């Protein structure tokens, strides 16, 4: 007689315990997420609709500011061929990315922000807090006086009242929450008919003020500018100037102009720019009125580059963007700089890798606080 077949019922799996954080009050969850570094927000947004909505809400950034957990973030204005409209990207930093080791690279990359509309070419891009002001430029091949405000917390844009005058290619700098728009072209040619006025926008009162522009390099185009100690350092093909916007005084600086500085940034009152011809990072100290070369990372950056962009970053660092001459790749490096005994400035490459592939051109880099 055959043995009976015994069929065992499958064991019931215990139900998944509820996520503890989902049991907490909403305000507690907001306070917890506000303390999480932003590099983890893309991962959090994939957990649930609740988290996706939370990390995109203005409230989370208000709490980050309240707790002192804000971070500096980089937004990059990019054109496809230097003739099309501007599209905005942000530098996305992967958590726990590998540090630069000579052969391996981290997974940092430039990510397109699709919710922002195209912006005018060759305008002014100024970051204040969590916002970016976009002023003037070319729109449909016409000079525009339009002003837009980008809210980097929500990646939305709104239109503000126009500038008093339409210009492109101006010198634009921020001093004491006032945006100085100096010169620029009022025709389709960047080299002709430079504007002879200076427009000042008070971001607190939201009012424009027109000032007569001194006859600095009449008929010339300004190529680069930075702010050091409340003064604007500007360069044309022929001269470099140090200008005080309060009394409109302007003095030539022949030592500063001895190098073809371009797309510079400032860290601790020292000007930095990357010399693509000599493949080196140069530093200008206005107190000593002397140029130097940053040491310590020779051979660690791409060579044969056709352009560079630098932007200052938190904690005594700068971010450098490079494009190699024969490749359609944008490289990015984060470099920590320090002044050592004897006055020499040394740099350390924290990481360096390709962040965007394709025939793109970086028009400007803007740092905001989120």
UniProtKB/Swiss-Prot annotation:
Main location: nucleus
Per-repeat ranges for Kelch: 131-177, 178-230, 263-315
One GO location term (cellular component): nucleus
Family annotation (SMART domains): FBOX
Signal peptide: none
Domain of life: Eukaryota
Compartmental location: Nucleus
Alphabetical keyword list: Kelch repeat, Nucleus, Repeat, Ubl conjugation pathway
A matching Pfam family: F-box
Pathway: Protein modification; protein ubiquitination
Domain F-box: 18-64
GO BP annotations, alphabetical order: protein ubiquitination
Chain's role: Component of SCF(ASK-cullin-F-box) E3 ubiquitin ligase complexes, which may mediate the ubiquitination and subsequent proteasomal degradation of target proteins.
Record remark: domains: The F-box is necessary for the interaction with ASK proteins.
Quaternary structure annotation from Swiss-Prot or TrEMBL: Part of a SCF (ASK-cullin-F-box) protein ligase complex. Interacts with SKP1A/ASK1, SKP1B/ASK2, ASK11, ASK13 and ASK18.
The protein, known as: F-box/kelch-repeat protein At4g38940
Species whose genome carries this gene: Arabidopsis thaliana
């Amino acid at each position: 007689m055959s043995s009976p077949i015994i069929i065992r019922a499958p064991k019931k799996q215990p139900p998944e315990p509820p996520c503890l954080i989902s049991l907490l009050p909403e305000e507690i969850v907001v306070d917890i997420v506000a303390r999480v570094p932003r590099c983890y927000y893309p991962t959090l947004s994939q957990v649930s609709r609740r988290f996706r909505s939370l990390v995109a809400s203005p409230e989370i950034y208000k709490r980050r500011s309240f707790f002192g957990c804000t971070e500096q973030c980089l937004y990059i204005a990019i054109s496809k061929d230097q003739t099309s409209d501007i599209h905005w990207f942000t530098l996305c930093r992967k958590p726990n990315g590998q540090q630069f080791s000579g052969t391996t690279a981290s997974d940092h990359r430039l990510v397109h922000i699709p919710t922002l509309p195209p912006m005018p070419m060759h305008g002014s891009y100024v970051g204040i807090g969590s916002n970016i002001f976009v002023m003037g430029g070319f729109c449909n091949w016409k000079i525009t006086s339009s002003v837009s405000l980008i809210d980097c917390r929500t990646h939305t844009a709104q239109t503000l009242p126009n500038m008093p005058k339409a210009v492109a290619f101006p010198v634009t700098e921020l001093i004491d929450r006032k945006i100085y728009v100096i010169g620029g072209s009022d025709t389709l040619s960047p080299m002709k008919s430079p504007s002879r006025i200076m427009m000042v926008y008070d971001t607190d009162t939201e009012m424009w003020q027109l000032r007569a522009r001194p006859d600095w390099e009449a008929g010339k185009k300004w190529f680069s500018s930075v702010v050091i100690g409340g003064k604007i350092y500007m360069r044309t093909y022929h001269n470099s100037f140090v200008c005080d916007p309060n009394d409109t005084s302007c003095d030539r600086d022949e030592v500063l102009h001895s190098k073809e500085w371009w797309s510079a940034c400032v860290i601790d009152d020292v000007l930095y720019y990357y010399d693509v011809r000599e493949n080196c990072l140069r530093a200008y100290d206005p107190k000593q009125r002397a140029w130097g070369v940053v040491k310590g990372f020779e051979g660690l950056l791409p060579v044969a580059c056709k352009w560079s962009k630098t932007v200052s970053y938190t904690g005594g660092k700068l971010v450098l963007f490079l494009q190699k001459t024969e490749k359609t790749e944008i490289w990015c490096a984060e470099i920590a700089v320090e002044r050592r005994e004897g006055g020499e400035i040394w740099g350390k490459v924290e990481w360096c890798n390709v962040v965007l592939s394709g025939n793109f051109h970086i028009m400007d880099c803007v740092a905001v606080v989120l």
